[in-house]
Amino acid sequence: MESFTRAELVAQRDGVWAVCGEVFEAYEKCRMEKGSDPELCLRESTAVVGCSQKVMREIVKNCQKELNESVKCIEENNMRTIPCEEENKAFNECFDKLVAPKFL
Amino acid sequence: MVGYRQKWVQDLPPAGGFPKLKYARTSTSPIPGAYIFAGVFSIMAVGTYIFFSDKVERNAREEEEKRRLSMILPILQAENDINFLASPHQNVYFTRWMPPQTGKRAAALLRDL
């Protein structure tokens, strides 16, 4: 399982929710219903990690430059995403053009 | 008899006498208290307005940041769950089950992902 930094995950939040939104909601619903024991929601958590990893792999393959710019901006602004709207817009354009057609 | 050569001059008031001293009270132009109160109040009102408008904007910004961060919480929590299950663990608490903090560890369940 590959690890990504918080800035990378936050930078691509809209993209990963567009693809894996249903899986995330199912996982959140399971955790809300069944409590904190991780074994009870193992299937959902595995699906969440698998889906996000898949999307991140495609993003790193196709939109590395835009992702790096977004991550650099977020890290320079103390993990704030609001000052990085321009970089995030460029990344979203790249995501919509190159990564989204493979999943949606 | 000492033979001083300097001619002594007595220190006397000037001819005609000293002018009168101005010892009467002189007050500045009076400013009414209401004017002072209004001025200070207006300054404080402006400052308070600036502070609260900036506070509202700051709170809105923080809420937006929190919302955006919460979008990635499923990923972080799922990774934490899988890392915890992939590590040797036992329940060491007697009150309720609480997941302990685990370091980064390769999850055996997703080794081929």
Curated annotation (Swiss-Prot), chain A:
Full protein name: NADH dehydrogenase [ubiquinone] 1 alpha subcomplex subunit 8
Function: Accessory subunit of the mitochondrial membrane respiratory chain NADH dehydrogenase (Complex I), that is believed not to be involved in catalysis. Complex I functions in the transfer of electrons from NADH to the respiratory chain. The immediate electron acceptor for the enzyme is believed to be ubiquinone.
Residue ranges annotated as motif Cx9C motif 2: 41-51
Ranges spanned by the short sequence motif Cx9C motif 3, renumbered to the chain: 63-73
Keyword terms, alphabetized: Disulfide bond, Electron transport, Membrane, Mitochondrion, Mitochondrion inner membrane, Repeat, Respiratory chain, Transport
Location in or out of the cell: Mitochondrion inner membrane; Mitochondrion intermembrane space
Topology within the bilayer: Peripheral membrane protein
Coiled coil: none
Domain CHCH: 17-59, 60-102
Gene Ontology CC entries for this record: mitochondrial inner membrane; mitochondrial intermembrane space; respiratory chain complex I
Disulfide bridges in this chain: 20-51, 30-41, 63-94, 73-84
Motif stretch (Cx9C motif 4): 84-94
Origin: domain of life: Eukaryota
Short motif Cx9C motif 1, span: 20-30
Subunit structure: Complex I is composed of about 45 different subunits.
One GO-annotated biological process of the protein: mitochondrial electron transport, NADH to ubiquinone
Family: Belongs to the complex I NDUFA8 subunit family.
From Swiss-Prot, chain B:
Compartments it resides in: Mitochondrion inner membrane
Lineage, broadest ranks: Eukaryota, Amoebozoa, Evosea, Eumycetozoa, Dictyostelia
Main localization, broad class: mitochondrion
Keyword field contains Heme: no
Membrane topology: Single-pass membrane protein
Function comment: Accessory subunit of the mitochondrial membrane respiratory chain NADH dehydrogenase (Complex I), that is believed not to be involved in catalysis. Complex I functions in the transfer of electrons from NADH to the respiratory chain. The immediate electron acceptor for the enzyme is believed to be ubiquinone.
Keywords recorded for this protein, A-Z: Electron transport, Membrane, Mitochondrion, Mitochondrion inner membrane, Respiratory chain, Transmembrane, Transmembrane helix, Transport
Cystine residue pairs: none
A Pfam family annotated for this UniProt entry: GRIM-19
Record flagged with keyword Electron transport: yes
Family of this protein: Belongs to the complex I NDUFA13 subunit family.
TM ranges: 31-51
Domain of life: Eukaryota
Quaternary structure note: Complex I is composed of about 45 different subunits.
Name of this protein: NADH dehydrogenase [ubiquinone] 1 alpha subcomplex subunit 13
Cellular component terms (Gene Ontology): mitochondrial inner membrane; respiratory chain complex I
